[in-house]
């Protein structure tokens, strides 16, 4: 018999993981972390039916739920990204301008900018003379203030 658990709310990130619990990581791509109304099967076969509020975005490190002494934690799954290595402030500004105009999410880590893979965007970045490397790695978009048109 398949066990099913319905997830309707999330623990606060600052609550952390209670001591004594086993932790099971649930790898999810950045797109999957926005799909909060779906069926998710854990490695042990437990089915989690996500029924979270519209607009919820799951964050890496967040505890999705605790069931029978097991904490299910969201982790960023490796996915195809473009990693841009700006060599100057001017190059970083060019990247920011181009990606910002396209309203694409970015992952800022250290001195590099990562974006989800897009062949046309890769070509545009290379045509600007930027150092761009295609990699498989986790992508956790950096929360930045937004605006609307």
From Swiss-Prot:
InterPro entries: UreE (IPR012406), UreE_C_dom (IPR007864), UreE_N (IPR004029), UreE_N_sf (IPR036118)
Record-linked SUPFAM superfamilies: Urease metallochaperone UreE, C-terminal domain (SSF69737), Urease metallochaperone UreE, N-terminal domain (SSF69287)
Record's subcellular location: Cytoplasm
Entry-linked Pfam families: UreE_C, UreE_N
Record-level GO BP terms: protein folding; protein-containing complex assembly; urea metabolic process
UniProt entry keywords in alphabetical sequence: Chaperone, Cytoplasm, Nickel
Major location category of this protein: cytoplasm
GO cellular component, one term: cytoplasm
GO function term, MF aspect, one: nickel cation binding
Function: Involved in urease metallocenter assembly. Binds nickel. Probably functions as a nickel donor during metallocenter assembly.
Family to which this protein belongs: Belongs to the UreE family.
Name of this protein: Urease accessory protein UreE
């Amino acid at each position: 018999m398949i066990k099913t658990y319905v997830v309707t709310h999330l623990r606060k990130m600052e609550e952390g993981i209670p001591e004594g619990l086993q932790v099971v990581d649930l790898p999810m791509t950045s797109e999957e972390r926005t799909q909060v109304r779906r069926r998710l099967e854990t490695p042990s076969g437990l089915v989690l039916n996500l029924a979270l509020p519209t607009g919820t975005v799951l964050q890496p490190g967040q505890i999705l739920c605790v069931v029978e002494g097991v904490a299910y934690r969201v982790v960023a799954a490796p996915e195809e990204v473009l990693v841009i290595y700006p060599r100057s402030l001017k190059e970083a500004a060019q990247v920011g301008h181009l990606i910002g105009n396209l309203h694409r999410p970015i992952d800022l880590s250290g001195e590099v900018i990562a974006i989800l893979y897009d062949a046309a965007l890769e070509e545009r970045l290379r045509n600007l003379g930027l150092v761009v490397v295609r990699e498989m790695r986790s992508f956790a978009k950096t929360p930045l203030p937004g605006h609307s048109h």
